[in-house]
Amino acid sequence: MLMPADTAIRRRVAVIGAGAAGLCAAKYLLARGVEVVLFELGSSVGGLWVYDNDNGLGPAYRSLHLNSEARVTAYRDFPFAPDGPLYPDHLEVRRYLQAYAERFDILRHIRFRARVQDVAAHAGQWRVQLEGGGSEDFDAVVVASGHQGVPTHPAWKDDFTGQYLHSHSYRVPEPFRDQRVLVVGMGNSAVDIASDICVVTRSTTISARSPVLVMPRMLFGVPTSRVLGKLEKPWMPWPLRRTMREILTGIVHGRMEQWGFVTPKTRTHPTSHPSLMSHFVWNRITAKPGIVSVKGREVHFTDGTSASFDTVIAGTGYAVDLPFLAPALRPLDGHRLELFLRVVHPAQRGLYFAGMFNVAGGGNIRMMDDQAEWITSLVCGDEVLPEPAQMRRVMEQEQSFLRRHYPGSPRYALELDPGFYRRQLAHERKRGRLRPTT
């Protein structure tokens, strides 16, 4: 239960971004009596769930849905409507976030169409400067501007002479009618787009560079996540869990090699789609391995084959772009943030990050609750952080865990294992309440 903050020490916090993470942070802070100013680049709440967002950063396409079940994705104290779909679309998620902002009286604290130009430490506080002039000082800043605003492109992008676009720019399938289209990648957006366009294209091909397990969205009439939740136990080693998932997937889809993919032997980000494999059965989609080179419209693959395409849609991920922060505080190589428990910069008191992760199973929004609650406790002085050296040791432990269990590609730079993370966070919060204040 959140208790009101000590009104004798009135805190003032800037939150950057009115997407799911920013709204959640604002809600927890406001509940403690903290003065919150939320800066939003666009003209509405919802972040990446706003179709054709006028902030210029939105990746939403017309067929976009949640990949995790609504009941395990929702904020802890604000469920989706009980009579709604299991997997809401972007319109329903946007309405949900709008309702959340209204329910917790967040809207009046938001400044829309406000671009943050610079955030810098100043006289024991944080100075936030806006584009067009004007600056304000805050006791703390929460960066919740998301990590899907700046697309990353393959090295051969300029070698392809047909139409090229990143999945970030995709909206609807109609412009690709009767074309030969190559979709690069096996992330959620890539498989969504391939399944979306294949009903109108002449041919649709997916290039999967890395091994992938395409799990069914439903098993035995319920979401697959529910089945896994009952079968998988905390004590189970990962190889046993992986074998279980391969068996369940094989019952529904067969072996991945049957469709041109390679079954992974390490942990990978889960891929799931309700109709992707059906399109393979109907020969609407075919698979190819990774790309060696591109010349004109001809693409050469690692298996020695080649094919010509009219359009390439690259689902090749994003770089984390935080131009308003000093270079030393920005992501390493544009991908990995050096943060203690994904929230705190060890050398910058009062600078917090929210929602800068990809959950390996489950819903991102639910994890944002945990982060926002912790940030609020830190802002209000309920918990005390360890020394920077200790924070860095914990950060290295987490990176070591990720290196052991996940591929080393940029896609996994923000990967977050929910079980491991929650154990770490619970342990830190217990210790933080016991540390003496300074």
Task: Give residue ranges: language-model regions.
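Long alpha-helical segments found as membrane-embedded helices
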Residues: 395-403
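Flavin (primarily FAD) cofactor-binding/catalytic cores of flavoenzymes
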Residues: 2-63, 74-218, 229-388, 403-438
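Charge-dense, low-complexity polyampholytic segments
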Residues: 389-393
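Flexible "cap/lid" subdomain of the alpha/beta-hydrolase fold that forms the substrate-access gate
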Residues: 65-68
